[in-house]
A protein has these predicted regions:
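Acidic, polar-rich low-complexity tracts and alpha-helical solenoid repeat scaffolds
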Residues: 1-185
Length: 185
C-alpha cells in the first residue's frame, strides 16, 4: 500500500489521510473508521485534520447504523462551528433533536449556533429552517413564517446547487396556506 511504501514520516501521514478520505468516498466504512482513528491518534494531525477525521468517523458510524456512536462524535464536533465539519455536525445534532420531537432543544441549539458567530452560513440557514419547522410542529405558524422569512431575506445562496431558498420558499407557501385557512375558520 501507499502507506507501507512511504519512507518519510510526512509521506506516511499524507498517505494515511489520503487512505481515510479514499475509504470514506468509496463507502468502505470499516476502513474509513479505522483510518480516521489512526489520523486522530497521530501527533502530526492538526485541529482541521482531526475535525475531518471525526466527521468521517461520525458519518461512517451513521452509514453502518451505529447512531449512538455517531451522535456522540457529532455532539463533540459541534462544539466548534467555525469550520464546515463542526457546522454541519451542529446542524445534524439540531435535526436529530427535531426528529426526536425535542423542539425546545432545537430552539436552544439553533440560537447557540447563531451566537457562536460562525461564518458557515449554509449550515446556520439550514438550522434556522429546522427551527421554523419546530415552530410549525408546535402550531406557532406566525413564528414559523417569520423565521422562514428571516432566512429568505437574509440568506445569500452560495451557488446554483444551494437548496436553502427553495426549502424556505416551499415552507413559506405552506405557512401562508395554513394561516389563510385559520383566518377563514
Amino acid at each position: 500500500s501507499l502507506f507501507s511504501s512511504a519512507l518519510l514520516d510526512n509521506n506516511k501521514f499524507v498517505a494515511m489521510t489520503g487512505m481515510m478520505r479514499s475509504a470514506y468516498r468509496g463507502h468502505d466504512w470499516a476502513k474509513a473508521l479505522e483510518s480516521a482513528e489512526h489520523v486522530l491518534h497521530d501527533t502530526r494531525s492538526d485541529s482541521k485534520i482531526k475535525a475531518e477525521a471525526d466527521y468521517i468517523k461520525a458519518k461512517s458510524y451513521l452509514a453502518t447504523s451505529r447512531r449512538a456512536e455517531a451522535f456522540k462524535v457529532l455532539a463533540e464536533l459541534s462544539k466548534d462551528v467555525s469550520g464546515p465539519y463542526g457546522a454541519e455536525a451542529a446542524y445534524m445534532v439540531i435535526q436529530d433533536s427535531y426528529d426526536r420531537g425535542a423542539f425546545e432543544e432545537v430552539e436552544t441549539k439553533v440560537y447557540a449556533f447563531a451566537d457562536a458567530g460562525s461564518d458557515q452560513v449554509y449550515w446556520l440557514a439550514k438550522s434556522f429552517i429546522v427551527l421554523g419547522d419546530s415552530f410549525a410542529e408546535r402550531e406557532e405558524f406566525e413564528q414559523a413564517k417569520a423565521t422562514f422569512e428571516s432566512v429568505r431575506d437574509g440568506y445569500e445562496p452560495s451557488g446554483p446547487d444551494d437548496d436553502v431558498i427553495d426549502d424556505v420558499t416551499m415552507r413559506l407557501k405552506k405557512m401562508e396556506s395554513i394561516i389563510s385557512q385559520q383566518e377563514q375558520n
